[in-house]
């Protein structure tokens, strides 16, 4: 049964009231943004908003921002096996994924506090009847949403990846002119992030490599960064390895802005302007969430 079918028969409204209530009680966030954050533990940033799709149009600005941050701060459960196959400890990936849900909400609320009254599903508030004739009609509409989202995401990714490649090409040309070899956007960010990696608890001698990996994750994606990590894993101490693995565990990269614009914008076109306006801020908040998880992991492992 697809998500649209579950909404049609009323199952999703019950799930929102119950599952979303757990994080709501702990953090004081709304049911819908809490459920979206929880869903990101199991599915990707493109699929999680579908869980609260009927509520997207009526979400407050803070709730919408929290949905965006939650998607970027986490990784999909379906990709964990792939990362584990690279040699990344599965227990670290699982811990980072579960920490991303409250961490993403925390950073989202710090950067975009709630100033409006959210919809209260626990009181029966929410969208009106969906208007579908039966389950088949609801399933067909859900399938069309999926195809529309996939096409929009593909188009946005092509544009963003092309833009990043253009910037790297320009930096490479500038480097050759001024005698700087292998100048790239991720390399520049690696130098920038070296002090940050040191602040997270990575020794200065290892901070350059750690900062470079964080830069690769931000500019490219976490998969590329994890592959690069496996090639230099021997350079890190156990605590540094944990910090790096936690810092890389999230979809917080430039391409994710394209995925949000294409995916979330396709199912909530009335909020597209806000989604595009919040893209970089959501990326910053999600990155801070990942770095906070990394710092906590390094602290507890060093104490153990």
Label each PLM-derived region with a short phrase:
Residues 1-3:
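Short, small-residue-biased leader/transition segments that mark boundaries at the very start
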Residues 14-28, 36-40, 54, 137-148, ...:
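Short amphipathic alpha-helical coupling elements at transmembrane boundaries
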Residues 17-51, 118-138, 183-189, 213, ...:
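Juxtamembrane inter-helical linkers in multi-pass membrane proteins
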Residues 26-84, 210-296:
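Alpha-helical membrane segments and immediately flanking helix-loop junctions
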Residues 92-107, 242-250:
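Alpha-helical transmembrane segments
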Residues 98-149:
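Long, contiguous bundles of hydrophobic transmembrane helices that form the permeation core
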Residues 144-233:
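Transmembrane helical segments that form the transport core of multi-pass membrane transport proteins
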Residues 296-304:
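Juxtamembrane boundary at the C-terminal end of a transmembrane helix
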């Amino acid at each position: 049964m697809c998500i649209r079918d579950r909404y049609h028969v009323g199952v999703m409204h019950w799930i929102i009231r119950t599952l979303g209530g757990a994080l709501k009680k702990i953090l004081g966030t709304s049911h819908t943004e809490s459920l979206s954050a929880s869903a990101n533990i199991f599915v990707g940033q493109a699929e999680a908003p579908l869980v609260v799709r009927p509520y997207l149009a009526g979400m407050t600005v803070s709730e919408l921002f929290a949905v965006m941050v939650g998607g970027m701060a986490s990784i999909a459960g379906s990709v964990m096996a792939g990362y584990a196959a690279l040699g990344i400890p599965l227990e670290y990936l699982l811990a980072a994924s579960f920490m991303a849900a409250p961490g993403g909400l925390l950073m989202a609320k710090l950067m975009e506090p709630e100033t409006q009254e959210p919809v209260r599903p626990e009181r029966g508030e929410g969208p009106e009847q969906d208007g579908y004739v039966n389950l088949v009609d609801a399933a067909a509409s859900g399938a069309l949403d999926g195809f529309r989202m996939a096409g929009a995401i593909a188009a946005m990714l092509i544009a963003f990846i092309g833009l990043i490649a253009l910037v790297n090409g320009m930096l490479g040309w500038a480097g050759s002119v001024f005698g700087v070899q292998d100048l790239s956007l991720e390399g520049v960010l690696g130098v920038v992030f070296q002090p940050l990696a040191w602040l997270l608890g990575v020794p200065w001698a290892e901070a350059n490599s750690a900062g470079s990996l964080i830069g690769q994750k931000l500019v490219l994606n976490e998969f590329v960064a994890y592959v690069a990590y496996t090639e230099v894993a021997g350079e890190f101490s156990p605590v540094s390895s944990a910090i790096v693995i936690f810092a890389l565990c999230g979809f917080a990269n430039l391409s994710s802005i394209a995925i949000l614009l294409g995916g979330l914008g396709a199912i909530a076109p009335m909020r597209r302007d806000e989604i595009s306006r919040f893209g970089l801020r959501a990326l910053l908040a999600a990155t801070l969430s990942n770095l906070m998880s990394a710092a906590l992991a390094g602290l507890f492992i060093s104490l153990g």
